């Protein structure tokens, strides 16, 4: 529960809401835009999933000077979805994205946030999870670390482009021109 019109203000405490949801088997909300910059929301996922049936993820960015709230592909968002995939918990997570930003085109904000989230989920799904678990189970820590490092440079971008191509969605930055055209043809004519 957040105060109306009061950004960065939370009524209650994280501990209270965690205990409330855990003792009543309720869905717990993690709002990625309301944590300290040194906290990584993904660190809470595996523990919470032991006690609550589902998670509601409000994926955004903290209040900053640059396009606040619009979801981007950053380490925090990628780590969040990697944690969900590694825990086999995508089916227990409900994802909502935040597109609030009065300084940029709303449709552009929507697409930037959606595409960034899709890229993070895809990169998490493409991680060689089975092999990493095998290394973990066998105590092969060097091999696990080496494979995790190699996975960072695997070409998920080509897979994302192919996915978009197969679904008749603009590939790469082609969507920018489509948004500009829509803005010219439609949104600029609104009062």
Region spans (language model):
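Active-site-facing alpha/beta catalytic cores
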Residues: 1-10
């Amino acid at each position: 529960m957040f105060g109306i019109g009061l950004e960065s203000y939370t009524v209650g405490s994280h501990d209270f809401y965690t205990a409330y949801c855990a003792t009543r088997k309720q869905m717990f909300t993690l709002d990625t835009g309301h944590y300290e910059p040194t906290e990584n929301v993904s660190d809470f996922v595996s523990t919470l999933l032991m006690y609550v049936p589902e998670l509601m993820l409000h994926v955004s960015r903290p209040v900053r000077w640059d396009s606040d709230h619009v979801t981007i592909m950053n380490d925090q968002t990628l780590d969040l979805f990697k944690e969900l995939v590694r825990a086999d918990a995508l089916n227990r997570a409900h994802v909502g994205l935040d597109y609030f930003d009065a300084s940029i085109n709303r449709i552009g904000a929507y697409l930037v946030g959606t595409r960034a989230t899709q890229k993070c989920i895809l990169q998490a799904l493409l991680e060689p999870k089975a092999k990493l678990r095998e290394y973990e189970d066998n105590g092969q820590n060097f091999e696990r670390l080496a494979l995790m490092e190699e996975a960072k440079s695997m070409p998920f971008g080509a897979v994302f482009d192919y996915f978009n191509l197969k679904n008749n969605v603009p590939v790469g930055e082609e969507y920018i021109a489509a948004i500009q055209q829509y803005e010219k043809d439609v949104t600029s004519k609104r009062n």
